UniProtKB/Swiss-Prot annotation:
NCBIfam families: PRK04998.1. This is UPF0250 protein Shal_3239. GO terms for cellular component: cytosol. The lineage of its organism: Bacteria, Pseudomonadati, Pseudomonadota, Gammaproteobacteria, Alteromonadales. It comes from the Bacteria. Gene3D superfamilies: 3.30.70.260. Transmembrane segments: none annotated. Belongs to the UPF0250 family.
Amino acid sequence: MLDTKFDELMEFPSSFPFKIVGDASDTLADRVVAVAQSLAPDDYTPITKVSSKGTYNSVTIRITVTSKEQIEQLYTQLAAIEGVKRVL
């Protein structure tokens, strides 16, 4: 697991923003939502932006998290999506 201090800095449950940057793809947002649904079922409306050259997409999604471990799982699984370069 990751060595984070989310439990010291946050109160749970909390709405937590994730920004995922990946290769330009029409399905990136759908894959991000699928991971979010698997760990924190809810209705999600991700915001997708395309980079100025069209090379990358960024997807921002707010997820209600209930624990430090859940945040760490989300970071790990979102980063494992094919084509993802960064999870912020």
